[in-house]
Amino acid sequence: MTTDTIVAQATAPGRGGVGIIRISGDQASEVAMALLGHIPKTRYADYCDFKDGEGEVIDQGIALYFQGPNSFTGEDVLELQGHGGQIVLDMLIKRVMEVEGIRIAKPGEFSEQAFMNDKLDLTQAEAIADLIDATSEQAAKSALNSLQGEFSTQVHELVDRVTNLRLYVEAAIDFPDEEVDFLSDGKIAGSLYRIITKLDSVQASAKQGAIIREGMKVVIAGRPNAGKSSLLNALAGKESAIVTEIAGTTRDVLREHIHLDGMPLHIIDTAGLRDTADTVEQIGIERAWAEIETADQVLFMVDGTTTDAVDPHEIWPDFIDRLPEKLGITVVRNKADITGEALTVTQDHGHNVFRISAKTGLGVEELQQHLKSLMGYQSNLEGGFIARRRHLEALELATSHLMIGKEQLEVYQAGELLAEELRMTQMALSEITGKFTSDDLLGKIFSSFCIGK
């Protein structure tokens, strides 16, 4: 990161009641002298004229001055809060740029300054963008929790535990005559198991946070003519898929992106799964399985007129056995308008079972509520944090190293190799908060921010 003084409009482009210009860097005080004729008292609102190079007034408004390191960016910061007309704001930026050495900020550069000056860690910086982009109250609350350090605190706790255990293991290695006793006394194993348990908990919360941010991928799967396309239409609230009585009508993947109370949901309708000689249908079935393997949840559609069973293993064991081990399954018994089934929601063998009529819409609202709960929707809006795909990847990598380290301890009692896996775990976790992060990754993250943030 350079030490340039940067300027940008901090409010959204366009017409508004108030417009804010933000300047951050060593020359902020020089800009204040040029435009205001004085440096405002630190952290006080100063109503004054904003003047051009000839002393003519461009606008009137509030000037706020924050002396580093006691500012958002950690640098000296000047904010000019004037009227929200775009022409006036452009004139102010042009005037600021007349001060030699000032340049326009890149997207996210103010937040990057804050990160580089240890005012924020990387998860908190990302949470700023996530708070701005939030599409639901739950997402906004979770992003705010991350901004306030909830996610970071849990990651830092894990890093501290891993670091302390690594130091203990390395101390044992330094005394080779006693190393085996150290490794087998149960203390190291106990600490390692507790770290793994804690990491599993954080990983589960992060997955929920990623769903809140990015949306849940739900695949509707089942045999031909079970009503999958009708359910897609019912959930989407429009006729997205062609529905006929002919089995195999849907031959390709159909996608709909909807919001349930602001929670993003990616619904995917797939070709009916069956053995077929039709080449085009075979391709559709292959694509269906590809979508299922990357789904967060499967709605297993069952034609209620063909079976009374509710246990998916009984309905179609080959299908269930092929599903990824940790994939969530919701059984949806369709055509309740024909079978006369009560529109109840039950649990069977650990799976939620819904009775609906996709054609008439009966029971669909209850299914929507279920999907919202799976996405982490909470009416009280308490708890949880936002997470991104890179966070999940780092947590998965950390888990992988811990499991390898566990094997080195339990099977081989190899202290050096355990210590190395703990070091790799520490690095993977530290990437989340930015303690060990490449410049390329930082550039990618901050470039996705708004200009002025």
From Swiss-Prot:
UniProt remark on cofactor binding: Binds 1 potassium ion per subunit.
Entries under Gene3D superfamilies matching the protein: P-loop containing nucleotide triphosphate hydrolases, Probable tRNA modification gtpase trme, domain 1, tRNA modification GTPase MnmE domain 2
UniProt xrefs under InterPro entries: G_TrmE (IPR031168), GTP-bd (IPR006073), GTP-bd_TrmE_N (IPR018948), GTPase_MnmE (IPR004520), MnmE_dom2 (IPR027368), MnmE_helical (IPR025867), P-loop_NTPase (IPR027417), Small_GTP-bd (IPR005225)
Family from the record: Belongs to the TRAFAC class TrmE-Era-EngA-EngB-Septin-like GTPase superfamily. TrmE GTPase family.
Gene Ontology annotations for the cellular component aspect, listed alphabetically: cytosol
Positions that bind GTP: 225-230, 244-250, 269-272, 334-337
UniProt EC number: 3.6.-.-
Keyword terms of this UniProt record: Cytoplasm, GTP-binding, Hydrolase, Magnesium, Metal-binding, Nucleotide-binding, Potassium, tRNA processing
Name the UniProt record assigns to this protein: tRNA modification GTPase MnmE
Enzyme class at the top of the EC tree: hydrolase
Listed Pfam families: MMR_HSR1 (PF01926), MnmE_helical (PF12631), TrmE_N (PF10396)
Cofactor requirement: K(+)
SUBUNIT field: Homodimer. Heterotetramer of two MnmE and two MnmG subunits.
Function in brief: Exhibits a very high intrinsic GTPase hydrolysis rate. Involved in the addition of a carboxymethylaminomethyl (cmnm) group at the wobble position (U34) of certain tRNAs, forming tRNA-cmnm(5)s(2)U34.
Residues binding (6S)-5-formyl-5,6,7,8-tetrahydrofolate, per UniProt: 22, 79, 119, 453
Organism: Shewanella sediminis (strain HAW-EB3)
GO BP terms in the entry: tRNA methylation; tRNA wobble uridine modification
Residues reported to bind Mg(2+): 229, 250
